[in-house]
Amino acid sequence: MNIHEHQAKQILKKYGANVPEGVFAFNVSDLLQKTKELKTDKYVLKAQIHAGGRGKAGGVKIVDNLENLEKEANILLGKNLITHQTGPLGREVKRLYVEEVSNISKEFYLSCLVDRVSSKIAFISSDQGGMNIEEVAQNTPEKILTTKVDFNQEISEADCKKIIRVFELDDNSGSEAISLIKAIYKLFIENDANLVEINPLILTKENKVVCLDAKMTFDENALFKHPEIQELRDYNEEEATEIEASKHDLAYIKLDGSIGCMVNGAGLAMATMDIIKLYGEEPANFLDVGGGASKEKVSAAFKIILSDKNVKGILINIFGGIMRCDVLAQGVVDAAKEIKIEVPLVVRLAGTNFEEGKKILENSGLKIISANDLSDAAKKVVEAIK
């Protein structure tokens, strides 16, 4: 689950990190009123959307008085902001954030995330922070330092020093940076975060280490433990279909292709998408039905897939382990009859009771194309939509 910058900064502040003073609002009138509380005559106006690249897209403005702030806020609020992370449709700006301008001396990059390969927490640091960090990673990867640390109650002083050594700070600012690393580690563990990113982390001309921007994501499977984090969720920033899928315990991510996928298991879902691409088409979604497939769940999955007007065919790929293929097949048949699917439907079943499942599909009277294996399924669904 993603949250907005202003929310992430409040969490950082709670853990003792330095962040610029700021205010947010959903309308310009409230924003101007709240901005008067800030002790500055120069402001940074920021669009609040769940996407990076706002600065290059015109979503960050520096203004020197309230009159200009009002003018820029009226332009930005309601604007469809298109960045390299939003896709061509962009994201509508529905909330704005204003903070005090910082006197920047140096810009750094700092992030903390789960490294699933090593099963450790990885801190990534660089002295090349700012809007061009992606280019730095691509063109000069030696400028980026990765430090992997074990899951513990606290991070060691030695690991903190490794992480910040690329910043080349003096003793005072170095001590602040170490305190920040400890704070980030603590909030990361305590809140089941997947990512904490500070870009840029800055050293001010007053020699203070300040989080100038902040991004956080949290493990959705752990949100039941953190109602205060759950309350920060902004459904306006999420795909309506993904919200609907979560109500039915379906893992769904919308993509840009033409073949809808319904699969059990994330690994099998990834393999299914790969083989669709191998046969020359693109998957329209990632959809994992998990370990159960009642008529209601399959019906919900079909409706979500078919709500995407780009879908020209559907591939169901099920390996029966915990899930019985005959139960899944009956759910598919019942749901297909109820919804009246008008695009080609290819089903591949393997595992527990797969023969019984195939018979249910064959005797359904529906135009369901049966496949023997994953390659056969991908080939048939690609041919069917031509």
Residues of each region from the PLM?
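Alpha-helix-loop-beta-strand connector modules within alpha/beta enzyme cores
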Residues: K337-K340
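Short internal beta-strands
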Residues: E342-G351
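Glycine-rich, proline-tolerant flexible connector loops at the mouths of alpha/beta enzymes
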Residues: I318-M323
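ATP-dependent carboxylate/acyl-activation modules
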Residues: M1-E197, I202-I316, L328, A350-E362, ...
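Short Gly/Thr/Asp-enriched flexible loops that form oxyanion-binding sites at enzyme active sites
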Residues: L110, R324-A335
